[in-house]
A protein has these predicted regions:
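Helix-loop-beta junctions that constitute the ligand-sensing/allosteric loops
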Residues: 47-51
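P-loop NTP-binding module
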Residues: 2-46, 57-79, 83-293
Length: 293
């Protein structure tokens, strides 16, 4: 083995937090050992940081460097060249965008107003009155920004009628929530999301003929109790609140909800009506989102 290269990188099968940036770049295939050697020589010659020297030699792009730095500091996001997931996962693909910053602001509000007020407060249902308001978009990206904070995060797709999280994340095959509620699976139906540390997804699973009845079973409450023992945050996607009572059932079990509206689309009267029904059911409304994405 090349002993000069050995002084630059210590090869490991997978990049892990705490590795030197050069080690991560080689382990992820962004740099070869030979190129890493060239960068190290240029780094010493110019007195630059390793990443800046690599960019100067045109061996890396700024995007490559940012992705490696995110792994070094345990801040997971996805390479834009990875098209296996939906571009709607803005917090994963564009973590430094204004939209992602707004999602982090929402995260802070939810932590201050709910999650940090009581150790038992783990779950938040994402609700809206109508279809197309962006519930699934907000739920998915909110789960991502919680996971980027180092919180063990579970995203549950409780929209058993028109689920979207499976299409957004394209995870490994899972029995899904419907199988859990039918008693055929358990928390193992939550699968890891590759590339995004600290995040697991429980997709909706097969569409049942009786979604409202399934969600109303004690099994859903038991699932959230089991999940609360393993996760710091549980984000739950729901169907449109004015079309079905499913969202209210989910929010009652979660005990907290965030209301999503879309600019120039959502009807204020419908959103206000849903908010009243939730509050009358004992649900704490923690945060509201005007979705302009």
């Amino acid at each position: 083995m090349n002993t000069v290269a050995d002084n630059i990188v210590s090869l490991r099968p997978d990049p892990v937090a705490g590795q030197a940036i050069g080690e991560i770049l080689v382990a992820t295939g962004r740099l070869s050992l030979r190129d890493a050697q060239r960068v190290a020589a240029e780094q010493r010659r110019q007195g630059q940081k390793f990443g800046e020297a690599a960019i100067g030699l045109k061996l890396l792009t700024r995007e490559d460097l940012d992705l490696a730095l995110s792994r070094q500091f345990e801040y997971s996001y996805l390479n834009v060249r990875d098209t296996s997931r939906s571009a709607e996962l803005i917090a994963a693909y564009q973590p430094f965008s204004q939209v992602a910053e707004s999602l982090r602001a929402l995260r802070s509000q939810l932590m201050l107003r709910w999650l940090q007020t009581n150790p038992a407060h783990k779950a938040i249902a994402i609700v809206s009155a109508g279809s197309g308001d962006g519930r699934s978009f907000i739920a998915a990206n909110l789960a991502i920004v919680f996971s980027q904070l180092g919180q063990q995060t579970l995203l549950i797709d409780a929209d058993l009628r028109d689920p979207r999280q499976q299409a957004l994340f394209m995870p490994e095959k899972s029995a899904g929530l419907s199988a859990v509620l039918a008693g055929r699976s358990g928390l193992e139906a939550a699968v890891a999301v590759s590339g995004l540390a600290n995040l697991r997804l429980m997709p909706a699973g097969a569409s049942p003929p009786n979604p409202q009845e399934l969600l109303g079973r004690p099994a859903f409450s038991a699932l959230l109790q089991d999940a609360a023992a393993e996760f710091d945050v549980i984000v739950i996607d729901t169907p449109a609140g004015c079309d079905y009572a499913d969202a209210e059932i989910v929010a009652r079990v979660a005990r907290a909800a965030t209301l999503v509206t879309r600019k120039n689309q959502s009807l204020l009267s419908e959103a206000a009506s849903l908010a009243r029904r939730l509050q009358d059911s004992g649900v704490t409304l923690v945060g509201a989102v005007l979705n302009d994405a």
